[in-house]
């Protein structure tokens, strides 16, 4: 694990001369301006130990952050990463994890494994960024994570769990992603499970497993038994549909073998506010997906919005084609919330500090070169950037690849950093003057697993479509393409063997509970 390696070795050297370390901290007595969420009289400022090259600070460890790290030339920059999560998560397969189709450990890759492949200086801080301070070119970190404290009680940064510090940067890459959006609906946070991180997957498994055990002790026909065996998935996008499909696979393929009576009573509900599921696909594929879900006993609620969530039931309102609105109460034992994103607090805080971002809502507004509008040296990629593109992994990956190539070119232009930092307006013209091409997104299509070894897919590049269809063969195509998308050979091999194991054995659903 990255954190354990780093804490046991302050400096971890490899034959490729990569340096992965925690930077030392010194107190400079710098007065905090109070720009962050909390004001401190003095704050420790972490100075980069290598000043021979520009310092690039990456926030996050998701698709944008790790893809940028993979492609930037670390011989030209000193690169630092801040993230409370010490690993990259392959999010497209996260819906497969709660029921044990793939192991959670198979879809994560420690940051150190990416960093050690780079030449140059790579520094990782296992901490949460709470404030970006563009006036000082620093990022405030709230504390080291609990993992850091666990592995190194006497951490050499000299920070206590709640003590802040500031890290300096020359360039900042904001790639913190987004957090789930509950749209202000009461009860979602209290009673629902999100599906965005590994802990969410474990929580869903624990809840469903506990409900199965409780329901097994109740007589058939008991209303409480029916409630415990009711699963509601809110969100008809890829995450929600794939989560519902994976749950139904577990019920039909595994639970039916050792608890057949319970399996017959499990009811999965899929709730979607739009008139159709998977609306990013063409209509015939979305219709195929809906028919398949319903044929596998998943109850699909379309044009249905959740109005309120209570401990054991939710209130939903359905708007029919004739405009009539009806209300229904859906009892549930497990509620999965898989719809909507919103900006994280560190990003909404930055909205207030840059006048050009004051009206931003969904993410940081960026120009054609992914530079945050109103800033000289802050760039944003992925879900925390707003460029009119869908919040998908392929968008973040392409943005990161593009930006890393731009940074390599920037390093070759004399005085580029100096000229960029001195610009007061029309900042993007500097990129145009030096013949930088604007970012252009290449839509490669979309994939979605439906359950029962069926999937739908649209494969394209630009305006040319190579494949569109659904069914068993598309399921195998889905698997092949997902394997190819995994960023490390290690994770790719582990996922492949998880699928091989699934063909011969049941899922490891109750492991670690």
Swiss-Prot record:
Gene Ontology BP annotations: mitochondrial electron transport, NADH to ubiquinone; positive regulation of apoptotic process
Keyword vocabulary terms for this entry: FAD, Flavoprotein, Membrane, Mitochondrion, Mitochondrion inner membrane, NAD, Oxidoreductase, Transit peptide, Ubiquinone
SUPFAM superfamilies: FAD/NAD(P)-binding domain
Functional note: Catalyzes the oxidation of NADH generated inside the Mitochondrion.
Lineage summary: Eukaryota, Fungi, Dikarya, Ascomycota, Saccharomycotina
EC number: 1.6.5.9
Record GO terms (molecular function): identical protein binding; NADH dehydrogenase (ubiquinone) activity; NADH:ubiquinone reductase (non-electrogenic) activity; oxidoreductase activity
Reaction(s) the record says it catalyses: a quinone + NADH + H(+) = a quinol + NAD(+); a ubiquinone + NADH + H(+) = a ubiquinol + NAD(+)
InterPro entries (alphabetical): FAD/NAD-bd_sf, FAD/NAD-binding_dom, NDH-2, NDH2-like_C
Subcellular location: Mitochondrion inner membrane
Membrane topology per record: Peripheral membrane protein
Name of the protein in its database record: Rotenone-insensitive NADH-ubiquinone oxidoreductase, mitochondrial
Keyword flag Thylakoid: no
Other facts: Present with 5240 molecules/cell in log phase SD medium.
Binding site for FAD: 55-85
Necessary cofactors: FAD
Targeting presequence: 1-26
Species: Saccharomyces cerevisiae (strain ATCC 204508 / S288c) (Baker's yeast)
